[in-house]
UniProtKB/Swiss-Prot annotation:
Keyword Chaperone found: no
GO biological process, one term: regulation of DNA-templated transcription
Family of the protein in this entry: Belongs to the TACO1 family. YeeN subfamily.
One GO CC term on file: cytosol
Phylogenetic lineage: Bacteria, Bacillati, Bacillota, Bacilli, Bacillales
One function term, GO molecular function aspect: DNA binding
Sorted UniProt keywords: Cytoplasm, DNA-binding, Transcription, Transcription regulation
Organism of derivation: Bacillus subtilis (strain 168)
Name of this chain's protein: Probable transcriptional regulatory protein YeeI
InterPro entries attached to this UniProt entry: Integrase-like_N, TACO1_YebC-like_2nd/3rd_dom, TACO1_YebC_N, Transcrip_reg_TACO1-like, Transcrip_reg_TACO1-like_dom3, Transcrip_reg_TACO1_YeeN, YebC-like
UniProt-annotated location(s): Cytoplasm
Top-level taxon: Bacteria
One Pfam family, short name: TACO1_YebC_N
Length: 239
């Protein structure tokens, strides 16, 4: 499972290099979460998750506040949450989550990104069965044993705990996201190195260099699309 954490790290690193894009995507996601429920994260669990994730990407406070105020103001801009599934080079599997205010624009753009980069879109369910929805929480300066002790004291069950880069990485069911964070916060943890609700591949594949290069171009093309929020895959990209 350690490889899966590396894919999240690589994804964070690539997005950190495109701060304006990641901020825009978070702004949209925060707006949608606040508009669909209460604009208060304490009474809106979906919004609370997005805000916790935003912290790990250092999203500026003004962007967060602007998105919430936009939702409070009754803005009429509506977004649909869409999921596309497809295949990359050598049968690699990809899931694309989007937020769009124009479905007729998004689907052709995603299909074109696949088609121009050695991939093809599949039907709903064609690859999702090979992924597990997972909460991933990273805590710096804790060993796996220390993290386990904290979680056991809080009576929180998780799937797995790994150690990497001086951090304990906790994998849990999505509905345990807040419980895991609260357990650590009550133990004095103030910041998290990662706080994600993600789709983790049940097994990963390694691509030859030429296919890997094409695969990375495909992922870049998908992530560059304005409506795309998240891209998940089952390829081991290495260090």
């Amino acid at each position: 499972m350690g490889r899966k954490w590396n894919n999240i790290k690589e994804k964070k690193a690539s997005k950190d290099a495109n701060t304006s894009r990641i901020y825009a995507k978070f702004g949209r996601e925060i707006y949608v979460a606040a508009k669909q429920g209460e604009p208060d994260p304490e009474s809106n669990q979906a919004l609370k998750v997005v805000l916790e994730r935003a912290k790990t990407y250092s999203v500026p406070k003004n962007i967060i506040e602007r998105a919430i105020e936009k939702a409070k103001g009754g803005a009429e801009e509506n977004y649909d949450e869409l999921r596309y599934e497809g295949f990359g080079p050598n049968g690699s599997m990809i899931i694309v989550d989007a937020l769009t205010n124009n479905v007729n624009r998004t689907a052709p753009e995603v299909r074109a990104a696949f088609g121009k980069n050695g991939g093809n879109m599949g039907v709903s369910g064609s690859v999702a069965y090979m992924f597990d929805a997972t909460a991933v929480i990273g805590v710096e300066g804790k060993t796996a044993d220390e993290a386990l002790e904290i979680l056991m004291e809080a009576d929180v069950d998780v799937r797995d705990i790994l150690e990497e880069d001086d951090s304990a990485i906790v994998y849990a069911e999505p509905d345990q996201f807040h419980a895991v964070q609260e357990a650590f916060k009550n133990a004095g943890v103030e910041e998290f190195t990662v706080a994600e609700l993600t789709m983790l591949a049940q097994s990963e594949v390694t691509l030859p260099d030429d296919a890997k290069e094409q695969f990375e171009k495909l992922i870049d093309a998908l992530e560059d699309l304005e409506d795309v929020q998240q891209v998940y895959h089952n390829v081991d990209l290495g260090e």
